[in-house]
């Protein structure tokens, strides 16, 4: 067992006095923790740091190695509570055991010694030395020996520490009380036997998800589980700021990329900047790296041209509202069939397309096609996506069949959107908007005019 070295003479004397004179406690209590004003004789910041560092160093020295040992952090609330208990000079009181924090179990190590006999650091080191008499394999202390200070000191799940010291008077003898409080506490018993303080194994190999980091200082023998400083396992370059909740870098102006590693000074003249790719998304009718070039309308992509309007038939399927959005992104709208001529030409084309055209997305539910007509419950009528009233109609026989169930349509999305139905010679049918259909985008003259002149 590794432990801090003390001079042989003084170490032997301390051990004897601990056995003969020292009064010790190592217990678990549900106390009341409150923010209080600093008490006279409380540990200063340097002493607190030394005790915390010593505790963590000793916890990293346990043998066999601990797989789940937590790193301790200093708690001013626990320190105030420990100071208050040290001031009792070993006299138990029920008042400390009552209060608001009954659910928080706190473990205690306490030592009473003649004043000046030992420093707090030496007392903690002697608590750890009790481990020489503790068998981790058997989970018990040697006969007629005390190990409870040791087991509390190395209790794996304890994560907070606070200590206090007080000079007491006992007749003509000055007594010094040393107290440390640990939260959560340890030394739990099952059927009269104290359970082992930690699980053995490779350091940090059994850390829980909330403390998945592994802390190891230069003077530590092994690692201690801690809240990871950087759970994303990444860092942002060029003064980027890491959001550890999303593991995303917020880059300063002029930089982009996952780690802000790409210098980007691109300006989009007619478009918006896509930060993650350092590129421009151009407005309709513009192209080029900076969206500065006026481009011609891509008439070669039209499947049909009717009276100057361009119609594009999708090779993929989607819901009605997603299909409408995709047409809008291209600068058009879902097809608006306002005459028998357009209806006849589309029906003829789609009938031929049914057996000749390949699709890139076979995950569609029907062989039908969305057009830009929906039922508006507020107006109790079908309207085109532009808001225009539907004057021309080509509903199939018996359709629309959900028109009378307005409440059902609104509540469940039945029959609110219109498709060209293959089984009815591509006449219209009202359908659930969440159905996945192919769709037809239309580019009328007002859409095409936004592009550069072309043929």
UniProtKB/Swiss-Prot annotation:
SCP domain location: 52-182
Compartment(s): Secreted; Endoplasmic reticulum; Golgi apparatus; Endosome
Glycan attachment sites: 144
GO terms for cellular component: endosome; extracellular space; Golgi apparatus; sarcoplasmic reticulum
PROSITE patterns per UniProt: C_TYPE_LECTIN_1, C_TYPE_LECTIN_2, EGF_1, EGF_2, EGF_3
Ranges of residues in domain EGF-like: 228-261
Residues in C-type lectin domain copies: 306-442
Matching SMART domains: CLECT (SM00034), EGF (SM00181), SCP (SM00198)
Protein name per its UniProtKB record: C-type lectin domain family 18 member B
């Amino acid at each position: 067992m590794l432990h801090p070295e003390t001079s042989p003479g003084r170490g032997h004397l301390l051990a004897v006095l601990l056995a003969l004179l020292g009064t010790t406690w190592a217990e678990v209590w549900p106390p009341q923790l409150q923010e209080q004003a600093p008490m006279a004789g409380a540990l200063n910041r340097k002493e607190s740091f030394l005790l915390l560092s010593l505790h963590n160093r000793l916890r990293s020295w346990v043998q066999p190695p601990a797989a789940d040992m937590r790193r301790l952090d200093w708690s001013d609330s626990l320190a105030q509570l420990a100071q208050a208990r040290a001031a009792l000079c070993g006299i138990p009181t029920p008042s400390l055991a009552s209060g608001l924090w009954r659910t928080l179990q706190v473990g205690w190590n306490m030592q009473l010694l003649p004043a000046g006999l030992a420093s707090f650091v030496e007392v903690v080191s002697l608590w750890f030395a009790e481990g020489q008499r503790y068998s981790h394999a058997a989970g018990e202390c040697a006969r007629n020996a005390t190990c409870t200070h040791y087991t509390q000191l190395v209790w794996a799940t304890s994560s907070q520490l606070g200590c206090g010291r007080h000079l007491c008077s006992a007749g003509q003898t000055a007594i010094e009380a040393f107290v440390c409080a640990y939260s959560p506490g340890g030394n739990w018993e099952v059927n009269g036997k104290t359970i082992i303080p930690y699980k053995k194994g490779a350091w940090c190999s059994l850390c829980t998800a909330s403390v998945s980091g592994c802390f190891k200082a230069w003077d530590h023998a092994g690692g201690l589980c801690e809240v990871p400083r950087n759970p994303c396992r990444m860092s942002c370059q060029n003064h980027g700021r890491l959001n550890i909740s999303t593991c995303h870098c917020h880059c300063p102006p002029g930089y982009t990329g996952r780690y802000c590693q790409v210098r980007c000074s691109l300006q989009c003249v007619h478009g918006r900047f896509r930060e993650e790719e350092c590129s421009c998304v151009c407005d309709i009718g513009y192209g080029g790296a900076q969206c500065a070039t006026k481009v011609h309308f891509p008439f070669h992509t039209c499947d049909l041209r009717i009276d100057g309007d361009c119609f594009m038939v999708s090779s993929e399927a989607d819901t009605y509202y997603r299909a409408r959005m995709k047409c809008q992104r291209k600068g058009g709208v879902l097809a608006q069939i306002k005459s028998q001529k357009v209806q006849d030409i589309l029906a003829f084309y789609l009938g031929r397309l049914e057996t000749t055209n390949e699709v890139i997305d076979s995950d569609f539910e029907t062989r039908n096609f969305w057009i830009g007509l929906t039922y508006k419950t507020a107006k109790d009528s079908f309207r085109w996506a532009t808001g225009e009233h539907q004057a021309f109609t080509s509903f199939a026989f018996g359709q629309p069949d959900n028109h009378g169930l307005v409440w059902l349509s609104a509540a469940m999305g039945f029959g609110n959107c219109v498709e060209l139905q293959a089984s009815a010679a591509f006449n219209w049918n009202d359908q659930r908007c969440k159905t996945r259909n192919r769709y037809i985008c239309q580019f009328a003259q007002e859409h095409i005019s936004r592009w550069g002149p072309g043929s």
